[in-house]
Amino acid sequence: LYKNNDFTIQEVHPLKGSICTKESSKDIYAVNEIVIKSVCSRTLHLDLRVNENKIQNFSGDGMLISTPIGSTAYNYSAGGSIIDPSLDTLQLTPLAPMNTIAYRSFTSSIVLSAKSTISIVPEYRFENSILVVVDGNEYRFNDITDINIVRSDLKLKLLRRSDFEFWKRVSEKFL
């Protein structure tokens, strides 16, 4: 493939997540998705904001933020939309949202401009029970105060076969 020059280069922007705790801040990067969920099997309550505008107090198993490349991975399995990788977007997909008289959470994914900042603030009682999953790798942080997710300015170069067609592959694998 490489020796025969039978490839194209696709540039993609990963997600950048800034995990802020009472003690420090750590940046993480994901090509596919960042998932915020509970360490144990219990409902999380999260304050969700987009560009500093409150969306809602979310209650459910967690929240998944994906890139267009990641839209066909865990995001799709969680009920999110498949996004054409040529589009400059972020996707926010709820995981098992609660909808009761006491809790109202959105039930479908939200597609946002890649210029958006997604802020997630856990209720104080959940600050030590959150698992951050980055492209399948699990991370635990103590005393999380907030999590901010943006499209990174970094560019990754993916080698693709010259005959790679996104929608053909989607139709073969998923539809």
Residue spans for each PLM region:
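Short amphipathic alpha-helical surface micro-motifs
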Residues: 1, 10-18, 29-31, 46-47, ...
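Catalytic core of DAGKc-family lipid kinases
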Residues: 1-61
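A generic structural signal for short beta-strands and their flanking turns/coil linkers
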Residues: 11-15, 30-32, 42-46, 61-63, ...
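Short beta-strand-to-turn element immediately C-terminal to the catalytic PLP-Schiff-base lysine
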Residues: 20, 36-37, 49-51, 66, ...
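Short acidic-glycine loop/turn motifs at beta-strand connectors
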Residues: 20-23, 86, 151-153
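ATP/nucleoside-binding phosphotransfer catalytic cores, i.e., glycine-rich phosphate-binding loops
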Residues: 28, 36, 41, 50, ...
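Gly/Ser/Thr-rich active-site loops/lids in small-molecule metabolic enzymes
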Residues: 57-61, 65-102
